[in-house]
Every structure is written in C-alpha cells, then in structure tokens.
A protein has these predicted regions:
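Carbohydrate-active enzymes and regulators
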Residues: 1-245
Length: 245
C-alpha cells in the first residue's frame, strides 16, 4: 500500500542512522538491556519480594521487547534503516524531507551565507544518503523569519531576504513552520504544552491578529516560488503533549 506519507529525516539524524559506530553501539545497548532483564527473569518470582510475580511479568515483557527490536534491526533491516527508508521512497510510498545541516535556528543565523550553508549541506546530505534531492524541508524548531531591512556596519540600509529565498536557491519547493506563523496569534501557548520547553516561562510578545488562514492548506509565498505549511496544533498536541498526547 503506497501510503503517500511525508517523512521528515533531518540531516543529523540521517548521518547518525548511517554511522557504523552508532549501529553497532545500538546493538550493544540492546544486548546489555537483554542481559539485565535475563537476570530479572532468573531472580523472580521471589517470595521474599513484594509483588515479585508482577516483576516477573515485567521482566518477560521487556525481554521480549528488546529481543524483538534487536531481531528487527539486525535481521529484518540488516542494520540499515537509511536503506529501508530509501526503498520505500523509491517505491513511491513516502517522500523524505530535509532540514538544516546542524539544526541551526534559522532566524538567529548571523549571515545569509550561514543560512545558505545550513540548507545546502542539509540538502546535499539528504541527496547523498537517499539518492535524490529533497523537495521539502522542516525548518529547525519550525522557526521562520521574513525579509527585513537593517542597517549594516557600513551605516547603510540593506535588505535581508526571507528564509524561503534561501530555500528556493537550494531547490526546496515547500517547507513546514509553526502554526502561529500561518494563523496569527501567539506561539507561547503552544510552547507551554508542546516539546521539552513546556515549563519555561517566556517574555510575552505582542499577539498577532488572526490571519484567516489555517494549517490544512499550503500557501505560496510572495518572495519566492516556495509553498509553506504550518504544523497543526491538534496533531502537535497528540504527539508532543505529556498531558493530552
């Protein structure tokens, strides 16, 4: 079944999955977990330990769990997850998107050359590992920056192009960003619920008025022939929220 799914694999993750040291290290990690739960299987049930029958059940559960993962990784996928993703990409089941090479926070990168390097190296990495250039991109941390005018060190005014111009220069046709960029409003509410930064207080920012757009559609941008889509709040909560996911 060709699911027609978009799968975002950042260049950093792709390089890690392709690294031989990491592959064999993962197998060693699984072996160590299996060895630990094997000891627990031998230890329980123990009449001197409360709830030891349940501890036996848990040990068996994790024994099966880690062995299943190892069997899949080693025997089913041949320790080559990149190859498996590429296979389903080539079959037309999935489309793999790229991202910044080192997950650099795009709006804070000091120069356009820094920004371009992030997405050029990221795009080249995706092509090298998966055999084709990505058409789409997940912005690191979904962080977007529009074009703006600034005063340079020379005292003159300069124009800094929006992020999508750099993406277009690297043959990227669409990208994903945060929901409030599309819909308006404030991003603080989302960040208090979504992700690892949920308990950090933020300095309140002026709330943008509602735009009338939603995250169920893609939109062409005026500065480049690139489309943008926003991360859907409801789907984001289901994935990231510790309370609602």
């Amino acid at each position: 079944i060709k699911a027609k799914l978009t799968v975002g694999i950042t260049p950093i993750l792709a390089e890690q999955l392709n690294d031989e040291h990491l592959k064999h290290g993962f197998v060693k990690y699984l072996d160590s977990r299996i060895a630990q739960v094997t000891k627990d299987l031998e230890r329980y049930p123990d009449p001197k330990v409360a709830h030891s029958q349940h501890l036996k059940y848990l040990a068996k559960y994790y024994f099966d769990w880690f062995n299943h993962i190892k069997d899949s990784f080693v025997n089913k996928y041949g320790m080559d997850l990149i190859g498996e993703f590429k296979k389903y990409q080539d079959l037309g089941c999935i489309e793999i998107t790229t991202s910044g090479a080192t997950h650099g926070f795009s709006p804070l990168l000091a120069t356009d050359s820094n920004l371009n390097a992030q997405f050029k190296v990221g795009s080249d990495t995706t092509k090298r590992l998966f055999g084709r250039k990505a058409k789409g991109c997940w912005l690191p941390e979904c962080a977007y920056r529009q074009g703006y005018e600034y005063v340079g060190k020379d005292g003159k005014k300069h124009w800094r192009p929006a992020i999508e111009v750099t993406l277009q220069n690297n043959d990227i046709e669409y990208f994903f960003t945060e929901s409030h960029v599309i819909e308006g409003g404030n991003s603080i509410g989302n960040r208090r619920v979504i992700g690892v930064y949920g308990n950090i207080e933020y300095i309140p920012l002026p709330e943008r008025p509602a735009t009338g757009y939603d995250t169920y559609s893609a939109y062409w941008l005026p500065d480049a022939q690139v489309a943008v889509m926003g991360r859907n709040d409801r789907a984001g909560y289901q994935v990231w929220s510790a309370a609602d996911g």
